[in-house]
């Protein structure tokens, strides 16, 4: 049975190249392989005697000067062909099957159920198949791949089994507690490139976002980090130092520019051999890369698990050790660098993330710009809210506000919920083209104040009836923030009784609507109002004087 794996060349929801499409994250055990290709085999085979059994590699050049290599394995029995797309997101590949007719092979993957937290899909929802049309040409395979209605093409050549394997396992360090770096005592606020730009991000784009962060008023509202996500990397030089690709000719100069705007600069890497998009990562070079990041002026590191999953089993102990290694390295640089753990909530990271030196940790799979994704992720966070404390935050992923996939009411719910959760507020839209409505949501000072409250107290569930929920969070000044949420598809009444709010039931002061920016008159034993579809009413109840 084939259980070997190779480098992952896919990134969440991105299908702009064949390498990304081939290795879309549909995880299953690959079929058995009857025979392995001999190393270097490249003989031309006639259609009548073609034998596709073996390992294949697709190398796709990109404008940034990098190549992404995607691997797959095939087994041929007569005209029937089975195999697997190999990736580094798990110890298994994605099964494919098809029939060879002359020189043409039609391969498909079976539609698979999405795991909980998968971007844009509900747990158990079917993911679309990958369709690969293959033509034999002089011992090579010309591929045309379609996934999520996107089609692209490339040529694959034979390779060896060894080429598909991850590098040898480096022993992990013994566990210990990394000292607190005393950073981000309230949740970090900023911007990240991935949600809007993904692999297209360039030096010029980042400079433009820094400019817009200031000119739009975002910086004044508290957003300070400008974070470059994946696809800036190239390779390593003769001394093992990580280098940047053509899109980022001088990373230190870019960081200096961001700093000149009064902002802070963030970067991305992975503990595996490659990042989620298939670029050079920090495996075996943690201390060296941390020093490089510090020398460039990096203030924030997002560290994405990605290909490390194929080297180390994802036990809580292994995950903690993986992230501890970079946590130690960052602190040894002497530069204050916010440490963002991104391992999708595996191993109950909220229980040990702070021990690695982490300041924030992703608690779920990737978010997407759709109500179902945001709703599922956001409302799943209440139970783990007690794990937050100053400098250490649950991270339900970046904000999608302004990207166009949700209504204004849904975006207000997004902002309200993340703020009640004391989640990092990392915008993911194009800051240059924000509408007034988007600005009013992202820069609502009264809502931001909820997120940034210094008490760092957890949110609590007050009431849950059908598709409506009432959440409550105490503030440092003695006030209480109450969120009335309607998760249903129709407008609905949502309310609470004062007796459900222990800190406010005896008597209370002014009640303020944080979205309407006006006081609300409440009399009697409680409050109820009609909340629009997927909407929210966010109230701040002052303590009585």
Tell me the role of every PLM-derived stretch:
Residues 418-421, 426-428, 464-503, 534:
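Carbohydrate-binding surface patches
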Residues 288, 331, 335-430, 451:
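Glycan-recognition surfaces
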Residues 1-14:
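N-terminal secretory signal peptides that target proteins for export/translocation
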Residues 195, 205, 209-313:
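Aromatic-lined carbohydrate-binding/catalytic grooves of carbohydrate-active enzymes
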Residues 40-138, 144-153:
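Central antiparallel beta-sheet cores of small beta-barrel/beta-sandwich binding domains
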Residues 17-29:
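Bacterial N-terminal signal peptides
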Residues 522-545:
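C-terminal beta-strand-rich structural cap/linker in extracellular carbohydrate-active enzymes
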Residues 187-193, 222-228, 264-269, 299-304, ...:
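Structural recognition of the beta-strand scaffold that forms the well-ordered cores
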